[in-house]
Amino acid sequence: MGKLSTHVLDTAHGTPAAAMRVELYRIAASGTPELLKRVVTNLDGRTDAPLLSGDKMRTGIYELQFHVAEYFEGRGAELAHEPFLDLIPIRFGIADEDGNYHVPLLVSPWSYSTYRGS
């Protein structure tokens, strides 16, 4: 069986983004999101266990939500009253239940990048 994982790197400080809140949603055919999991990244900017694995790993549309403003405020960053990046949603599809899907996020208070990792 495959798995879904993530890894968050803080490019403003050059470190893993430890203690960032991340939520995983499955998007129903109607477009309604269903919360599957809430996690906080560990000291390495990763989750302690895969976000999905085993029989929970199903094809479909998913969304990861990264609470970046909350994270950077916790690091002492001076953000505007309305931060440029608050919550970053990344919506993606899982086409193969046996595939390994890794969604890295490289982020600063002003920019982000992601890709499908392995």
Swiss-Prot record:
Substrate binds at H7, R46, Y115. It is an enzyme of class 3 (hydrolase). It comes from the Bacteria. Keywords: Hydrolase, Purine metabolism. SUPFAM superfamilies: Transthyretin (synonym: prealbumin) (SSF49472). PROSITE patterns: TRANSTHYRETIN_1 (PS00768), TRANSTHYRETIN_2 (PS00769). It catalyses: 5-hydroxyisourate + H2O = 5-hydroxy-2-oxo-4-ureido-2,5-dihydro-1H-imidazole-5-carboxylate + H(+). Belongs to the transthyretin family. 5-hydroxyisourate hydrolase subfamily. Homotetramer. NCBIfam families: hdxy_isourate. HIU hydrolysis also occurs spontaneously, but more slowly. This is 5-hydroxyisourate hydrolase.
